[in-house]
């Protein structure tokens, strides 16, 4: 646990946690925080010397305390303990985690069982690697070594004005390599611009991925997956490393819905959002990364949700995905071992590398370098490059840049800077550069606040409420769940079924969606409510039997992104009254869906006891079971979503440097250029005017494509077509096939016309 905290928890939170541990290590401190539970035969004892029942009593007391800091302490201990216990393997257990067997979790596949890479899909690695510099792995000790390393990639290298400065030149520098940065780099380089990509994380080849949470969290997630508000009320999951979130996302690839595009065009001064430019951009990116419907087989996990929605008569649809329709290894959140997912490293980043771009990994972009004179278009200044410092590890260093001890600095001289470090890092980068755009940089943080509901299914069960002829759209029928009768949330296609029943797409456009999350054992253990040691042990012993539903809300309210004393991003967020009510609506629907699918026990990430559902011999709820379900739903409504009593998380962050037609209401103009500084463009999720209500990846990529295409055209460059680009209207057809527009609608699968299989820069392979 100490390793996890030291490497993944921000310094202020880390200090608070270690202070708590110090206080609890004394008898007086334990009495102060634990009351009479810290007394044994009338004498105070430090926490570690108390009997287990007393320790549990203290922590349970904190959970119910009216003092927010005690509630926070209970949540922090529970979360970190769950993550640490189930995340790390130990040599004594043969390289496995001793708790995996007890929870029925198999761990990573053995070499013999590992799904083999698809050679045609991994051809991109041979293109990408020769143009990649990994400063963390190479660790050049000084400027001379750094210059030699960069020169070996064909860059013209020179000395800067200060000792230790290493200067390279480009037409454009892209900060970040995820959905936004990858697309921007690919478009710009393919148009003939000299492009350098700066990425603070590292690159992992498919064959080198261990496929464990212990590796993925610290190396492929921001803050190791522990990126919370100061009060711990919200936790953010965001990708890190070369390829960003596209390397660990759950494959959901929704084209931007029409009602969102209309809102952005009409209310935010962005007419291109409903015009042919955005249509073309969306078709290009959806085609290149291989978006389609028609999953070959829904996992047990998704089948449970589909059966429950069928039982309720609610809308259910199939999620478009950017992977092969037969891909079902369940490892997407730990990195794709086969290349079957169209992430940036197999698509646009590889296109960029093939066109001559250089990707510099392990380079932390500190700030934009600007001219002293006003720009020709009237903006206060113009970009002339980026200052970056080398990273010694993927972990963000909790010291000021001038104190990090780097023997050299990297200066990329370029008149065009593309900020694409993600919704959390882009505003921090701009703020460190003095670019605030009238205060709009860092405002308007939207996160799609999410929580989870889960149900336990008995061995050998048949899902209730769906006749054998029914099917979840686009794939295998929901009833019965096959195999041993266990759900195995970590196995099969991660995300394929969803519901927009209460999303209000035809009205306000704001409301909850239901999907299935990717759930491996440590992430689940860190999130589930804790009701005591015995209850937690029993809960985790049934890990294969649980099926979970993710409730995602399109938020109308917003938060704020700010920087700490080291210049790193931190954030404040708590859902508005409307958004919390939307979450409760989604929680109710999810509970009813799991009950309708045949669960014998349901619970949620709210601090409420689980509900056992009494069923008759036919599997249907008894009258008593039905009454108990209604009472449980009433309790959920009365409890509501409360800070640190409901686990709230986010996998989608948006809006912190938004586009708009009015500089008084946005950070960037419709072309993506900041209102304050010429030549600085935002092309990631930060550019969203509002939240999108669906997985934002394809919208990010489309915005990045449109912004980069515009810059290239204004530079007098021709922008070539993208391999596998869809014909006009194909994205709309995919979205229509996905959600159907009605309850339980079943639409035929829509294949893409190209994808990631055609090799880098070549024509895509059609999917049927």
Residue ranges and their predicted role:
Residues 178-180, 201, 414-416, 420-427, ...:
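Glycine-/small-residue-rich beta->alpha transition segments that form the dinucleotide
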Residues 1-89:
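Acidic/polar surface patches and capping/hinge elements
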């Amino acid at each position: 646990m100490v390793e996890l905290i030291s490497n993944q928890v921000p310094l202020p939170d880390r200090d608070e946690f270690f202070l708590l541990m110090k206080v609890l290590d004394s008898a007086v401190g334990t009495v102060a925080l634990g009351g009479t539970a810290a007394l044994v035969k009338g004498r105070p004892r430090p926490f570690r010397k108390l009997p287990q029942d007393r320790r549990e009593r203290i922590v349970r007391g904190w959970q119910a305390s009216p003092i927010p800091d005690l509630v926070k302490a209970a949540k922090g201990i529970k979360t970190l303990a769950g993550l640490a216990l189930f995340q790390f393997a130990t040599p004594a257990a043969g390289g496995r985690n001793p708790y995996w067997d007890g929870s029925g979790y198999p761990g990573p596949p053995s070499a013999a069982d590992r799904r083999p890479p698809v050679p045609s899909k991994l051809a991109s690695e041979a293109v990408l690697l020769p143009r990649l510099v990994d400063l963390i792995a190479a660790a050049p000790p000084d400027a001379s070594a750094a210059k030699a390393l960069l020169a070996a990639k064909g860059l013209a290298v020179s000395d800067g004005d200060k000792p230790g400065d290493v200067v390279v030149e480009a037409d454009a520098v892209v900060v970040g390599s995820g959905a936004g940065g990858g697309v921007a780099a690919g478009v710009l380089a393919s148009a003939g611009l000299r492009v350098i990509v700066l990425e603070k994380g590292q690159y992992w080849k498919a064959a080198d991925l261990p496929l464990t949470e212990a590796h993925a969290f610290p190396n492929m997630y921001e803050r190791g997956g522990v990126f919370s508000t100061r009060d711990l009320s919200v936790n953010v999951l965001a990708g890190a490393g070369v390829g960003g979130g596209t390397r660990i996302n759950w494959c959901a690839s929704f084209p931007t819905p029409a009602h969102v595009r209309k809102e952005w065009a009409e209310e935010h001064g962005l007419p291109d959002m409903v015009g042919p430019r955005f249509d073309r951009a969306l078709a290009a990116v959806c085609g290149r990364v291989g978006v389609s419907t028609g999953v070959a087989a829904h996992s047990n996990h998704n089948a449970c949700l589909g059966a429950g929605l069928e039982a309720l008569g609610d809308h259910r649809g199939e999620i478009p995905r950017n992977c092969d329709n037969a891909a079902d290894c369940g490892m997407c959140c730990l990195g794709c071992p086969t290349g079957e997912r169209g992430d940036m490293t197999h698509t646009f980043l590889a296109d960029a590398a093939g066109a001559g771009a250089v990707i510099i990994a392990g380079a932390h972009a500190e700030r934009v370098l600007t001219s002293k004179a006003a720009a020709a278009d009237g903006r206060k200044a113009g970009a002339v490059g980026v200052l970056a410092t080398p990273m010694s590890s993927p972990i963000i260093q909790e010291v000021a840049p001038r104190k990090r001890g780097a023997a050299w600095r990297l200066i990329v001289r370029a008149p065009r800077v593309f900020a694409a470090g993600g919704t959390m890092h882009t505003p921090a980068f701009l703020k460190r550069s003095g670019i605030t755009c009238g205060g709009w940089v860092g405002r308007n943080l939207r996160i799609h606040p999410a929580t989870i509901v889960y149900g336990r299914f008995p061995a050998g069960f048949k899902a209730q409420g769906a006749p054998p002829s029914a099917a979840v759209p686009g794939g295998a029928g929901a009833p019965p769940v096959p195999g041993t009768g266990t759900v195995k949330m970590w196995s099969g296609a991660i995300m394929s079924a969803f519901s927009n029943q209460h999303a209000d797409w035809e009205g306000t456009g704001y409301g909850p969606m239901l999907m299935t999350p990717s759930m491996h054992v440590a992430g689940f253990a860190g999130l589930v409510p804790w009701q005591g040691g015995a209850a937690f042990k029993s809960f985790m012993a049934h890990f294969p039997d649980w099926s979970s539903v993710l409730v995602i809300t399109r938020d109308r309210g917003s938060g704020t992104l700010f920087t700490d004393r080291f210049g790193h991003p931190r954030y404040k967020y708590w859902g508005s009254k409307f958004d919390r009510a939307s979450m409760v609506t989604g929680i109710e629907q999810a509970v009813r869906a799991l009950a309708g699918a045949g669960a014998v026990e349901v619970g949620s990430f709210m601090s409420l006891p689980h509900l056992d559902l009494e069923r008759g011999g036919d599997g249907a709820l008894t009258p008593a079971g039905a009454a108990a379900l209604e009472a449980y739903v009433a309790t959920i409504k009365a409890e509501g979503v409360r800070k640190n009593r409901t686990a709230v998380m986010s996998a989608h962050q948006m809006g912190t440097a938004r586009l708009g037609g009015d500089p008084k209401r946005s950070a960037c103009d419709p072309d993506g250029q900041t209102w304050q500084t010429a030549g600085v463009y935002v092309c990631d999720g930060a550019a969203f005017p509002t939240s999108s209500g669906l997985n934002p990846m394809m919208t990010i990529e489309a915005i990045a494509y449109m912004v980069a295409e515009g810059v290239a055209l204004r530079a007098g460059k021709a922008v070539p077509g993208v391999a596998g680009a869809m014909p006009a209207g194909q994205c709309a057809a995919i979205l229509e096939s996905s959600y159907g527009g009605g309850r339980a609608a079943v639409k035929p699968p829509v294949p893409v016309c190209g994808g990631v299989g055609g090799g880098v820069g070549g024509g895509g392979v059609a999917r049927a």
